[in-house]
Amino acid sequence: MKRVLRGALIPALVFLLWEAGSRADLLPMDTLSRPSDIAVALAGGFVDGSILLATWQTVQAALSGFAIAAAAGILVGAILGLSPPIERTVGPSIEALRPIPAVALTPLTLLLFGFGLRMEAGVVAFACVWPILLVTVAAVRGIEPRLLEVAQILRLGFAARLRKIILPAALGRIVVGLRVALSISLIVAVTVEILMNPRGLGYGMIIASQSLKPDLMYAQLLWLGFLGWGLNAALTRAFGSWHGAFGPGVRP
Amino acid sequence: MSVPPLLSLAGVSVSFGSPADGHEVLSEISFDVPDGEFLCIVGPSGCGKTTLVRLLAGLLAPSGGQILFQGRPLAGTSRDRAIVFQDYSKALLPWRTVAGNIALSLEACGIAEPERSERIGALLAKMRLEPAAARFPSQLSGGMQQRVQIARSLAQQPKLLLMDEPFGALDAITRQDLQDEIARLVAENRTTVVFITHDLEEAIYLGDRVIVLAAEPGRIAEMIEVGIPRPRDQLETREDRRFLEHRHRLFGLLQGH
């Protein structure tokens, strides 16, 4: 609790100075709204439900894209990590696709899916799949060969080997890729909304900005920051307890 | 009409690299292991001990010669042949408890509850691991971790137990404890063992028979019957006239040069 208070000290100070500065007419009101006005705008957005709806739309797109990327990235990554010949065949194509900026696919997904959830989730999935895929390949390759020999001696089939040896042994490192991908998912979802998809918090911010309501824009921006922090904390918590399965003091 | 040996090697060789300039690791290895024998193989480093145990496990195929297991050519791994590795910390699953690690073998053998739990309980008792059942390998001493690996190997009820320098990384006192323990377990279960070591005294102390390998390329230098009755004793056996004779005779062979 003491740590939380200590961490909140600087933001509280910034808001206080900001409020005081704008009340003393030291800050330009048309770009830097007052924190009190921002709080009112945020509360209003919650009361009329607009922020909640936009949040749901953004999070839904980010998480759908992330989930697709996680499933595809881990499965393909495990196969590539286990089979060097397949990796040598598929690897160059991956290296050719990977540098394409995900956001540049927005026009293509618009053609494919039209406006809405599917185009946004598609772009998010494309952006998120690479870190998960690459980390999974490296993690599976880095598995202690002794463990694979144990699996061989016990004659575990492919599915059992994947479930009982490979994934648990690699998961500690795969989680790193998942965390990177999760933060990317929110960034890309909001970017696609700001670019052209008329839904979610990104679109809400563009509209607020264009209709000269900086307080509402700031309200959504702050809320977005809080959302990203919450997502990351949830993931850390979920896998923090999983790390515990290794016993105290052991990190894979 | 004699009973065929459990394991039989005839002219087995292993080379790495191309046939022309390949490096020969094992050359013309031939020996039989009858059912129930405790065979120790001792040799200096670089004599292909580990390569030999990988051959017997089926993790490696020979370049020449033939290996028969139960009268049939040995091809690939089998749950009838268990292996205890020297590096116990790498061979155990760090995310599973002691009981969970033993369960892995039983899962692989398709043994379902409640029999699985019963057999885990029996093995924990046999290996004196009961107090550690719910702990993780990283929380155990080296000796305890090696006990877990031995328990996991016994769980698959192998016909042949392969041990690759299993006590090489342990301190002297723990090593003696585990030597007596494995001798007792093997006598109880009548398991056939091929035990690899670089410690001549350990080989004579544990084995019914000792094979000494020479290096470059790995080949059989000598084979002796130990002929000291069991149960053996860490003090008395090591002072036994026959023990000392074997030790004197084989010591020179391990000096290399």
What residue spans do the PLM features occupy?
Chain B
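Q-loop/switch helix immediately C-terminal to the Walker
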Residues: R96-E107
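The feature captures the beta-strand-to-loop junction immediately N-terminal to the Walker
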Residues: V42-P44
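Conserved ABC ATPase signature
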Residues: F136-L140, M144
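Conserved ABC ATPase "signature" region
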Residues: E107, A112-A132, R184
